[in-house]
């Protein structure tokens, strides 16, 4: 029997939405049909009980599909609020990707609304036939990912319903637990395993020991790797990186043996791998601790923007495959950025930033070696470096410092005494003192047409070299003018005008 001991305080928007749904339900009942019982479900109820405002509401209907109810809702709003121009979108079930419920979505009064029917106890199989089978609130609650997400708010009775009998207690005790045996819950949809970790690290809850056993199941890991769309996994990881304790999330994933099935190579990569060194999964706990420490202690890394931290965490997540390479379009490439693209389905700009971290690490270390030997870099050297690294040059240098510390196995407690720390800071200071922070934006001081006209030469590959030389001359001579460059160019002709 459901517990209904908690009363929720709805804001004005939620009250109006509740009234709208109840009115639609009544209108359906007046059409010689069973009046649907409408419940707000899942995350919205959880967050209201935690006193967290939510702009997403899942709506559960007991006697018809979510899309059918949404069509009645759309008709009602077209009559009562034509200016809202409410549109309903139907998202079909996709059992092959463990999405078993048809969903209707709409945006109403600034709220994102998902409408579904109550899950049947065998809903993963019942939708394979043409006949839609409706469940009871208890059946639906038991088929959800966690007890704290299996709570309902009954719009008619205005009470919270806890059909599992554990949701309110687990919410109070800060426990993440599956409503059924974990293997069964994760069997319905393996992505729930990732969601459980996300909820634990978002709300600082502990995962129940029985749920942990299910999370360690190798069969679950294989299903996550092979049967869940990588876009869905990418969405969950994105939420972990943006809204959770990422440090703890990655540690939990590692401790459960789930790192490879979430971040690692897929079957599509197997035949194209060129070098496959031992996965450095043992590095992960130290890498996580190190980055956490540097965010507190290092003068540069503690000032990373949220977007830069996001890229850092993705690079750390793919670190175990740093020394792996893959053949793509006749080119040998390092594996981590490929994993960002394929295993998480993230955008090309994100993939490129992770790639720059790894690809430019040797270049940064070569500059550090020069600094250690000579104590300084030239103005041109700093300008060339920033142009090579691009607008995220600071992050790439910070990553190189992080990687160098990680690889050298420095004791975290001794980092402030490490000589390498000062040299990475010196490199940044050199760039700043030379005013090269935006060297990647420097354009040629003269264009190609002007060069061909002034020197009386034809266009060709040599022109690109001369334009590049004009940029480097500009880096070396920031106070000089275009006329100064033309004079030198006339004196030297097509030969170089840059002092290497």
From Swiss-Prot:
Q: Is the keyword Transferase assigned to this protein?
A: yes
Tell me the segments the record calls region Flexible loop: 122-139
Q: Which GO terms describe its biological process?
A: mitochondrial tRNA 3'-end processing; tRNA 3'-terminal CCA addition
Question: What EC number(s) does the entry state?
Answer: 2.7.7.-
The reaction(s) catalysed by this protein are: a tRNA precursor + 2 CTP = a tRNA with a 3' CC end + 2 diphosphate
Q: Which Pfam families match?
A: PolyA_pol
Give UniProt keywords alphabetically.
Nucleotidyltransferase, RNA-binding, Transferase, tRNA-binding
Disulfide links within the chain:
none
Q: Where is this motif: ERhxxExxxhh motif?
A: 231-241
GO CC, sorted alphabetically, is:
cytosol; mitochondrion
Gene3D superfamilies reported in the protein's UniProt record: Beta Polymerase, domain 2 (3.30.460.10), cca-adding enzyme, domain 2 (1.10.3090.10)
- InterPro entries found in the cross-reference section: NT_sf, PolA_pol_head_dom
GO molecular function terms noted in the UniProt entry: CC tRNA cytidylyltransferase activity; CTP binding; tRNA binding
Q: What does this protein do?
A: tRNA nucleotidyltransferase involved in the synthesis of the tRNA CCA terminus. In contrast to what is usually observed in eukaryotes for which one enzyme synthesizes the whole tRNA CCA terminus, in S.pombe, cca1 specifically adds two cytidine residues to a tRNA substrate lacking this sequence while cca2 specifically adds the terminal adenosine residue thereby completing the CCA sequence.
**Family statement drawn from the similarity comment of this UniProt entry:** Belongs to the tRNA nucleotidyltransferase/poly(A) polymerase family.
Q: Any domain commentary?
A: Cca1 contains two alpha-helices (His-81 to Thr-86 and Glu-479 to Asp-484) and a beta-sheet (His-120 to Lys-131) that are not seen in cca2, suggesting that cca1 has lost A-adding activity because this beta-sheet reduces the flexibility of the loop (Asp-122 to Glu-139) as compared to CCA- and A-adding enzymes. The ERhxxExxxhh motif (residues 231-241) has been suggested to serve to distinguish between A-adding and CC-adding proteins as A-adding enzymes have a small amino acid in the first position while CC-adding enzymes have an E in the first position.
- Which PANTHER family would you find in this protein's record? CCA TRNA NUCLEOTIDYLTRANSFERASE, MITOCHONDRIAL (PTHR13734:SF5), TRNA-NUCLEOTIDYLTRANSFERASE (PTHR13734)
Name of the protein this chain belongs to: tRNA nucleotidyltransferase cca1
- State the organism named in the record: Schizosaccharomyces pombe (strain 972 / ATCC 24843)
